[in-house]
Amino acid sequence: GDTSKVNPLSPVDLVIDHSVTVDHFGDDDAFEENVRLEMERNHERYMFLKWGKQAFSRFSVVPPGTGICHQVNLEYLGKAVWSELQDGEWIAYPDSLVGTDSHTTMINGLGVLGWGVGGIEAEAAMLGQPVSMLIPDVVGFKLTGKLREGITATDLVLTVTQMLRKHGVVGKFVEFYGDGLDSLPLADRATIANMSPEYGATCGFFPIDAITLEYMRLSGRSDDLVELVETYAKAQGMWRNPGDEPVFTSTLELDMGDVEASLAGPKRPQDRVALGDVPKAFAASAELELNTAQRDRQPVDYTMNGQPYQLPDGAVVIAAITSCTNTSNPSVLMAAGLLAKKAVTLGLKRQPWVKASLAPGSKVVSDYLAQAKLTPYLDELGFNLVGYGCTTCIGNSGPLPEPIETAIKKGDLTVGAVLSGNRNFEGRIHPLVKTNWLASPPLVVAYALAGNMNINLATDPLGYDRKGDPVYLKDIWPSAQEIARAVELVSSDMFRKEYAEVFEGTEEWKSIQVESSDTYGWQSDSTYIRLSPFFDEMQAQPAPVKDIHGARILAMLGDSVTTDHISPAGSIKPDSPAGRYLQNHGVERKDFNSYGSRRGNHEVMMRGTFANIRIRNEMLPGVEGGMTRHLPGTEAMSIYDAAMLYQQEKTPLAVIAGKEYGSGSSRDWAAKGPRLLGIRVVIAESFERIHRSNLIGMGILPLEFPQGVTRKTLGLTGEEVIDIADLQNLRPGATIPVTLTRSDGSKETVPCRCRIDTATELTYYQNDGILHYVIRNMLN
């Protein structure tokens, strides 16, 4: 065949940011050591990506150790308006974007319409397929007033997230307007736009205005581009004028003067908690964990570096300044540095059990912290640079020191992580950390000093100065004037310097040699990259869709099941199906790497499907982790093992779930994995947008229970057998009768709604998935 047909039709930038792990921390060598380990562990994957760079046109690679894709996009790649020569004339048109990470929405802060899609949908878009969707409602969010002294952009975004989740914006666009935008810096806008997936919207859009242009100049964009953006936006009616009141489907309003210092946790980004209420929220979550308020967890003795310590219940064991959400924002980074400076000056120290780290989304952050002379103070408190990448925010927090891990297990302690990230789902940050809290960078530093979630930072001392006097948060919190003076040190020269060689990479990256070829040379013994089975039995023409007969329920799940629950990205347990597979193929435990790094190997990923250590399958009450029953038997076994038994029996499978199924990351393996396990249908109360699309893209049918009907109202046990007929005549949005046969032989038919929303999606489903459809189109 003609391999040149398989080439992107639109410009594609691949930014490598998800692989660096915080193995080393707390010293000046941490960055170099983590980069060395990243290159060592991921050498084969990086060879594959480098091969792709030379094999495809319109395809650029930003090497590892450079930054986080959304921050690199905001600071450098995004244009706001594109221009190109067509038929001898220059044409200008709005920038737009889809990305394979849900936080792609960050670019909406720059006035660029963009959102996350699954990898399979992105691959199809690269090859010329349209991104189809129902015309969305547009919710207007009016911002008025200004943030008060001491309140950060992080506090604002956590408040916005809570409000919009409550309002209900899944599948909708959100546009921000109001006089509050007149003084809202672009970095704050980007923080709010970044967390669109957390509030459930397809995007959170900020229109182009003078503040947009100011940021483009600061970040080193050319004068010609800035002039084009202004001229084009004004000519096309895309320019925001003060006082504009667009027409929206619905609206809500926030006076930014009402925003208070906040965290979100312990396991959902929308669960905002006022700073003074954190100890109470932590205690409630710890009691829930115990199922009793009676048990008193005592501190556990441990020794580290020859010193005896006690690890208390509620200890903050991870404090991470991480994630593009906040490290793209100079005001909160400078605030963290200034707070660190005041703390060090007074003699405060990080608690010895806290693993602290600083992982910015771009090298510019290091430049301006150094320019402000704040780096030494962050280093003194253990917030040394550990990498330029996602790290803790995506679960690459690395191991805790061995004495800490042992103490947590010994005392069955409920401990916490505080991070400046965007997600805090169960089991995501670290397997032993049961509560995870989102906070601004200065609060991350403050919690590293306090070291305990039970300490009320609004009223209790963080520690004691050299004289023994108590030091409170208010004593070291920087003023708005101090922060503003520090932010003035950020210059366009910093951006130009760091992005001048953004595609070059380190010497280690440059030294990777690849074969010049249009086709990849698969290695049969590779445990990282294997030829996937998704095209194994594909025919030139799609077969008619088969009805679902005699399907068994593989898992019955509750509300807010995330793609992290379905396909975790973090560490691989040695005694899990994926861990056993790797060991059987000669991989030592120290070389397991993460599920995220093994995504090129379907054997690992299908074994990791539903393998999150915190997932709860209601078919096995009281059991945590990826376990189920192989029906009609009663024995508990891993979901993977049960699925393989069902495949031997040729039994199709179903998943039953509650509200917001598939929220979180745009992780396509959360659809690919279930497909390989034999799942044909997912029936839920509601779906998150990207995951619903991914399921269809892999030929899995998403169905919604009718309003008011749930697995609980139906009294489902998971032992039911499911039949769904007449799938050849499926229509978008149609009502589909689902027949449930209970273990006593009684039957009930439930009219479910087909969540294939568009004719294009139906075509993908009828082709057994989007990739089959694209390949068939190419063959024709």
Predicted regions and their residues:
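Fe-S-dependent hydro-lyases/dehydratases of central metabolism
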Residues: G1-N780
